[in-house]
Amino acid sequence: MKFGNIFSYQPPGESHKEVMDRFVRLGVASEELNFDTYWLEHHFTEFGLTGNLFVACANLLGRTTKLNVGTMIVLPTAHPARQMEDLLLLDQMSKGRFNFGVVRGYHKDFRVFGVTMEDSRAITEDFHTMIMDGTKTGLHTDGKNIEFPDVNVYPEAYLEKIPTCMTAESATTTWLAERGLPMVLSWIITTSEKKAQMELYNAVRDSGYSEEYIKNVDHSMTLICSVDEDGKKAEDVREFLGNWYDSYVNATNIFSESNQTRGYDYHKGQKDFVLQGHTNTKRRVDYSNDLNPVGTPEKCIEIQRDIDATGITNITLGFEANGSEEEIIASMKRFMQVAPFLKDPK
């Protein structure tokens, strides 16, 4: 079982300088506590201050020796050759510790960078295929979404296969399964829904991949985590989650104009699926707490054993809800004490 974490949220009252300083220190602490991967995301929001993920990854990879560092890149917002140069350089200089993670993005991403949001799925899939194939054959395009001359991008890859993953709903799950690529499952869906997503992936996986290959596809799951002997203190993450949800809604606009965006069914689904009909932050937070390892070690172990049922052995955790830097690190330490109770279903 592998464990990673994700950071860079700006809590109310903290400056960007404080967030960035803490972000770097928690990256170093993650390696010291034997976490596997440290993830970064970018959304033009308070919950993703690391605007240039490749630069932030370079900083953390340079400060560590074992920690893997990964992105949640919005692929359509930059030229694939530019992004491929960045990922190849990080792959070489870190000796294979970089993970090229991909997300679809929100309205602000596309409006600021001048990309049509309705075409984002097709562009994401095209750019991802182009970049991953290009690490072996050189970069070329069929001209459907972008035009440029064929080019060899340097340096060559350090790893034979650069680690990659993508956040997924049903259409993306099918696309990833057809290619034998790993998906990232959300922290805001139930265990039964995660199992259903895995079953969908497995149902469409017959694309020339062996059973052994599919068995070892490294899917990951995201969770909010707060482990404390004092169950009441752990429940205090509700205030943090309330602020997070509010910034999420403000950033994505998923409850208004995104609902009318052609080809963006995922955002439409978020309104009904994520909120489950709830219209206030408190009820959304209650819903989230019930799905995630928040509470005493015993409660967290119970929730984590449900995770085993999905067959996923790569877990990404959000610890920032625990408060100060010291409290975050304390909860990270307590989690690593709980972690052995997670079995490896493989």
UniProtKB/Swiss-Prot annotation:
GO terms for cellular component: cytosol. It comes from Photobacterium phosphoreum. Light-emitting reaction in luminous bacteria. Keywords: Flavoprotein, FMN, Luminescence, Monooxygenase, Oxidoreductase, Photoprotein. One of its GO terms (biological process) is bioluminescence. It holds the Pfam family Bac_luciferase. It catalyses: a long-chain fatty aldehyde + FMNH2 + O2 = a long-chain fatty acid + hnu + FMN + H2O + 2 H(+). InterPro entries: Bact_Lucif_Oxidored (IPR050766), Bacterial_luciferase_CS (IPR018235), Luciferase-like_dom (IPR011251), Luciferase-like_sf (IPR036661), Luciferase_bac/NFP (IPR002103). This is Alkanal monooxygenase alpha chain. PANTHER family: BLR5498 PROTEIN, LUCIFERASE-LIKE MONOOXYGENASE. Heterodimer of an alpha and a beta chain. One of its GO terms (molecular function) is alkanal monooxygenase (FMN-linked) activity. Its EC number is 1.14.14.3.
